[in-house]
From Swiss-Prot:
One of its GO terms (cellular component) is plasma membrane. Part of an enzyme complex containing four subunits: a flavoprotein (FrdA), an iron-sulfur protein (FrdB), and two hydrophobic anchor proteins (FrdC and FrdD). This is Fumarate reductase subunit C. It is found in: Cell inner membrane. SUPFAM superfamilies: Fumarate reductase respiratory complex transmembrane subunits. The gene is frdC. The lineage of its organism: Bacteria, Pseudomonadati, Pseudomonadota, Gammaproteobacteria, Enterobacterales. InterPro entries: Fumarate_red_C, SQR/QFR_C/D. Keywords: Cell inner membrane, Cell membrane, Membrane, Transmembrane, Transmembrane helix. Belongs to the FrdC family. Coiled coil: none annotated. The chain crosses the membrane at residues 30-50, 57-77, 109-129. Gene3D superfamilies: Fumarate reductase/succinate dehydrogenase, transmembrane subunit.
Length: 131
């Protein structure tokens, strides 16, 4: 059965998400995928440069020393840290840890995740720089 009644469709602008801070932050957090793609492409180029010998690697290092690339990589690092922060804040909501019949708060989980991240970073830097 068809009807001739026209349903009401509420108008919505394409910038509706800019009105609420929650949605603005959500879009910013989801936008961290773009710098992650940049870093992935950069890493692939690094692997090819490493495979093609010392001259190609030296060219890649020269590319990385370009001030524009340094700024883009700093933006990428900032985006990765923001994504990590929001992910670590989400982790306690997925884990129900009960100690002595009480649910553990999110702070110990978040702090332990950051501690593991810092330790892993220090170990990787030590191996990369001094091994």
């Amino acid at each position: 059965m068809t009807t001739k009644r026209k349903p009401y469709v509420r108008p919505m602008t394409s910038t509706w998400w800019k009105k609420l801070p929650f949605y603005r932050f959500y879009m910013l957090r989801e936008g961290t995928a773009v710098p992650a793609v940049w870093f992935s492409i950069e890493l692939i180029f690094a692997l090819f440069a490493l495979k093609n010998g010392p001259e190609a690697w030296a060219g890649f290092v020269d590319f990385l020393q370009n001030p524009v690339i340094v700024i883009i990589n700093l933006i990428t690092l900032t985006a990765a840290l923001l994504h990590t922060k929001t992910w670590f804040e989400l982790a306690p909501k997925a884990a129900n840890i009960i100690v002595k019949d009480e649910k553990m708060g999110p702070e110990p989980i978040i702090k332990s995740l950051w501690a593991v991240t810092v330790v892993a970073t220090i170990v990787i830097l030590f191996v990369a720089l001094y091994w």
